[in-house]
């Protein structure tokens, strides 16, 4: 389920308030499911939050250790947790670990800017990977520019890279 940035921020702010201004595995663990749901989080997401919180508290997931791993092992470790998919793992690699060569071809926002940039409707994974191969080893940096283009509203204007 995709959330708008505004809705996501609101949920985060509510959770932050419930956790006493600091969201930690311990503070989240102390909350009831009902309290977490009251932030606007679905039952399924409450379950996923519990899974991640339990993994951190048990030591089976250590975010500091993820920094030391290459990209694929990070994706594998994160997606092994119920509720975390490839999209989430890639966003973590790009925006938290600042990895330079992650291509988020599954992301709707990325694909919206990609369609605008290349004036195409073909957003199949094979096509996107082929066209973006020239971005290596800086795919994440290019993706960040495409996200910024979307944030600025530029995709609402006509543009074609090869005019």
Positions of predicted regions on the chain:
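Generic structural signal for hydrophobic core residues of well-folded globular domains
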Residues: 2-3, 15, 52-56, 96, ...
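Alpha-helical ds-nucleic-acid-binding substructure associated with the helix-hairpin-helix region
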Residues: 3-82, 134
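C-terminal accessory module of base-excision DNA glycosylases/AP lyases that mediates lesion recognition
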Residues: 86-163
């Amino acid at each position: 389920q995709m959330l708008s940035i505004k809705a996501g921020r609101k949920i985060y702010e509510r959770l932050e308030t419930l956790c006493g201004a600091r969201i930690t595995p311990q503070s989240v663990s102390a909350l009831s499911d009902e309290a977490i749901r009251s932030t606007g989080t679905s039952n399924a997401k409450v379950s996923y939050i519990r899974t991640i919180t339990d993994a951190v508290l048990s030591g089976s997931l250590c975010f500091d250790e993820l920094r030391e791993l290459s990209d694929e092992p990070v994706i594998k470790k994160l997606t092994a947790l119920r509720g975390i998919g490839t999209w989430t793992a890639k966003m973590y690699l790009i925006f938290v670990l600042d990895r330079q060569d992650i291509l988020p071809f599954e992301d709707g926002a990325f694909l919206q800017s990609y369609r605008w940039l290349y004036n195409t409707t073909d957003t199949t994974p094979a096509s996107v990977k082929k066209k973006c191969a020239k971005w290596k080893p800086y795919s994440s940096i290019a993706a960040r520019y495409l996200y910024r283009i979307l944030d600025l509203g530029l995709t609402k204007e006509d543009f074609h890279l090869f005019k």
